[in-house]
């Protein structure tokens, strides 16, 4: 089935915090909400620490999620697939209230299945960012994701 940009209504959904204590607020800004399979996702990640923190390592990737929601039986496990990790910076200084902006480009696979919702299952796409803090300390991994729509026809 071919799904093109004219077939979808897309809007920017709120950023989802997946894990962490939000000691550093991470925002993902994208050039657009809809991408064609094989296209490059262009955007930027903005880190805004809430306090002085150990230096951090930031990386981004695409994520495909399949949800199972059958009508007549228990849902299956679904699953997630993460794309190639794109490192954006190592040992980034994280100082209270000082934003750090890092641009990125993430290539989508040419054979990426489109975002779709059907009776029994759905496929959703995201851009995710993850921030690791340096050293052995009490600071948790921070992870966020923003949904995108993937189509397979112009």
Regions found by a protein language model. Give the residues of each.
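C-terminal beta-sandwich interaction modules and adjacent acidic
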Residues: 1-154
């Amino acid at each position: 089935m071919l799904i093109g940009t004219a077939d979808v209504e897309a809007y920017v959904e709120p950023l989802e915090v997946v894990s962490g204590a939000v000691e550093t607020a991470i925002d993902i800004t994208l050039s657009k909400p809809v991408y064609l399979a094989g296209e490059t996702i262009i955007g930027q990640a903005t880190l805004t620490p809430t306090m002085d923190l150990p230096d951090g390592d930031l990386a981004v990737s695409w994520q495909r999620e399949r949800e199972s929601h059958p009508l007549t039986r228990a849902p299956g496990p679904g699953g997630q697939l993460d794309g190639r990790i794109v490192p954006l910076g190592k040992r980034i200084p994280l100082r209270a209230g000082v934003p750090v902006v890092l641009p990125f480009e993430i290539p989508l696979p040419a054979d990426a299945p489109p975002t779709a919702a059907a009776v029994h299952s759905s496929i959703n796409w995201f851009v995710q960012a993850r921030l690791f803090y340096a050293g052995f300390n009490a600071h948790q991994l921070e992870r966020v994701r923003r949904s995108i729509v993937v189509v397979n026809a112009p």
